[in-house]
Amino acid sequence: MNVYYHLPGLFEFYEFYKKFLPLFKNKTEYFYDWCKIGSVYGSPSDCIWSGGRISYADCDPKKVFALMKEYNISSRLTFSNSLIEEKHLSDIKCNELCRLLSLDTNNGIIIHSDLLMKYLKSKYPNLYFVSSTTKVLTDFNDFEKEVENPDFTYVVPDFRLNKQLEKLNSLSESYKPKVEFLCNECCWYGCKDRKECYKSVSRQNLGIDCMGHVCKAPFSKEGYRFSRVMENPAFISLEDILNIYVPMGYSNFKIEGRDLGSALLLEFILYYMVKPQYQIHVREAMYLDAMLDLF
């Protein structure tokens, strides 16, 4: 079974992917044989339909979508704002992005709002839909109902369902290909404010004057540290993917990080996708040379 990774930073890391994707295509011996890129997701700046994160990326969408099409990779717009109202549906920029995206039937939308999905289904029928993790589906029954919804091609559950292995194993075999696990979530496992955090981002993307959410989680002041993420009870390691999830019939895994630096994105790729003996080769191809100084 192939494993499909859904990578962050469609717009945010455009320059990174311009350099990385030729490497992924032409140096196949560097990467695990079973490893595929299912999609790259993100959004440009100033999109009121955006959710999950606030993007500051400013790339030409035609070039972005063309790059992904060249390598037969699905582009996904993260239009997961949870506070969309009827008045927001006519937004010119977001509609134009969807029009461009829908020129290729391989592309999709990560979505939260039912109102927005109904609108997009009618206006851009070529697009597929991914149920966003911003819904914070922590109850397995709610998650199962979401997976059963034919409107969704994929569903990203809350990361705290990642290790409910007995229930995941019992899920219908026909639904398992729809499940997309978030592997490297940095959010505190005991967080009670996850929904409110995402709502705050939705308000800001809509241009509403509001206070940003203040994270109260332990170690929040440290920022994202992959080493600490690996200690999260919900973390899905490479070994977990190969030894637990793939044998159960799961094949889709999401990597977060579009608001991080490209150095961390490379570390995620090295960890999940690159054979250990070739990790130095990938570093050298991407940035490392004999004259690079760290300090």
Per-region residue spans from a language model:
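Active-site pocket-lining/capping segments in soluble small-molecule metabolic enzymes
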Residues: M1-D142, F152, V156-F295
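Solvent-exposed alpha-helices and their adjacent loops that cap or buttress functional pockets
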Residues: V147-N149
